[in-house]
Amino acid sequence: MAHKKQAWAKRVKKERFKKKYLTRMQATRLLQMESIQFRRLCILKGVYPRALTRSKQKQSGNEKQYYLAREIKWLVRDHIAEKMMTYRAWEKKVKRAEAMGRADDLKALQSSRVKPRHSLVATIKERYPYFIDAIRDVDDAMSMIHMYAFLSPEIKSESTIEIHHSLTSGLSEKAKEMCHRWNRYIARAHVLTKGFISIKGYYYEAIIKGERVRWLCPHEYAHRFPPGIQQYVMLSFLEFYLEMMKFVLFKLESDLARDEADRLAIEDEEGLTRANAEDFASGAALAVLDVGANQAQAKVKEAESKRSLMEEELLKVRELFRGLTFYISREVPAKHFALIINACGGRVATDYVASNITHVVVDRPALPPGWQQHDQMEYVQPQYIFDCLNARQMLPVTGYRIGEDLPPHVSPFSVSITNSAEDNAAVEQVKKDHPRIVGYVPARVHEIRKLINPSYSPVDPEGKVAQLEDEYSDEEMHVAVPEMDMEDDVSLSGDELAEARKKPGWQEEEVTEEVQRPKLSAFKVKKQREMNLMNAPTNEVVARRRQALRKAQENLRQSETPEARLQRKMSEVKRQEAVTRKMQLQVARKKAARFYKMVSGVVQGTAKKAATLEAKAKHIAEGKLHKTEDGKGLVNARLAARRQRAEAKGKKLKEKKADNPYKKLPKWVQ
């Protein structure tokens, strides 16, 4: 039986847990709504289940979802929850009017003035107190909006307060309009920096207010929505993202219009013939909130260096297609390529006129019938536009013309294509956020870097380091060490990998001149040293020497060049390979010895069995053994005769004891 204090402590902990957390069932009862409405409300308000510790989860049950009680109580008086309750009351009135056949009341209830509607303005202000917080969520928002923009609606409805399990016409039209506004802003502000074509769709990156925003536009093709997906969850996110992007785009467009007006005013004052767009557009794209007077100076310098690198990146992209005119063939998705061309300062022609066009984008093995090829035009494939954007330079059209085999299309998000400071900083940030990305540099990237900078020489042109990383990946380690099973292997998490990759900073250790001890303690230490019963403390001179040696090694490692580091890594890998080879050889020897022992045991056992059978056959031939009456065994003839003679005299022959099975074991086992 538990002690009174222990029982009281358990009771206090249980009561405290009940006050802090609520289950999903308790939350729905408190809010007086169904589970579907509760989930939709949590999505709109940004309330998510909490992950408990293992002990708490074990006590409460593994299948339960827990929410913070203060967040659920905060939802009780929320205006969206009130509107949901109002809508439930309105539904009851509509059903009653339909049942009683009151057409006038039903028409009045279904009018837009009476039907309840909820607003997400206050919710967006609560979730995003600063504009930069909303910018950081634009990537998920635009990816989902672009996905639903090309899906066909299945329900005709303009309101979103009711729960729909398919895309409505109102949300579809809003998504298409939002995509059009977003692409128009990206093209006008010239903030597009990267693009990539993958099997999932088109990946883009833009720099907006000092933040890198990446979004995905899917390929537009005939689709079928997969079953088993709760679409009301996705539509709740879509509704919130549409309302959020309305605020974000209003702010961005107003800032862009203000900057353009200021630029025109300065042009009129100074009488400039050409606007210096960099002074305004880059500042508008990279305007970051004030870091505050209380922040550290290091963070301020880091933000300034990051801003300068992003500004250099935007300046290179903005004038990329300046003075060039592109004609896009009808088989090429014009929306995506027009976005890149306009964002990079180019112009898209609507008619195929030879005097104005410089480049024609065609995705066919030959020109369409009726087209005449002109010498002053370059007929390129669509990948050329993306590769020029990622390289920030007009690449040679060799290899991109019609009918030619295209070079590899490299993703600019995991590899620094230009090898510039801004690209390297962006890739390092991506690797920091996603540690599992392999830093392999393809040969095509080395070619582009050579075109940009003729004096460029690759550190690892053959990709030996990446090959070694692939050899010593998680899957290959199982091959190198056969004794290790899949159950024994535990993969590290992202935080553990980031912690392991941190370089430990050098810390100065204080070495005391003389260690002062009491007389008794000093006498004990002296005796223990003489008797060699303890590890005596290191001498001060030896400690200083070791400390200086470690510090010199750390300084040498931090100051080594990439070539020296590569050579050191290669030598370490070779040493590790030798150790692994030696271990594999030992394992192979043990396996061979075990196999030889097994084979020899089988062979010897077979020979012994054959000798036993031969002896039995010989004894049967000589008459020493004969079959039993049932014919299933053999009987010793001499032993049977002795037993018969003893029975005739009225005596009983002693039976031989059975063999002891433990006799062959060691004595300590017996």
Curated annotation (Swiss-Prot):
Which key words tag this protein in UniProt? Coiled coil, Nucleus, Ribosome biogenesis, rRNA processing
Q: Where in the cell is it found?
A: Nucleus, Nucleolus; Nucleus, Nucleoplasm
Tell me which SUPFAM superfamilies the record gives.
BRCT domain (SSF52113)
Coiled-coil region: 292-321
Q: What InterPro entries does UniProt report for this protein, alphabetically?
A: BRCT_dom, BRCT_dom_sf, PES
Give this protein's Gene Ontology molecular function annotations: ribonucleoprotein complex binding; RNA binding
Instruction: Tell me which family the UniProt entry assigns to this protein.
Output: Belongs to the pescadillo family.
Please describe what this protein does.
Required for maturation of ribosomal RNAs and formation of the large ribosomal subunit.
Instruction: Indicate what this protein is called per its UniProt record.
Output: Pescadillo homolog
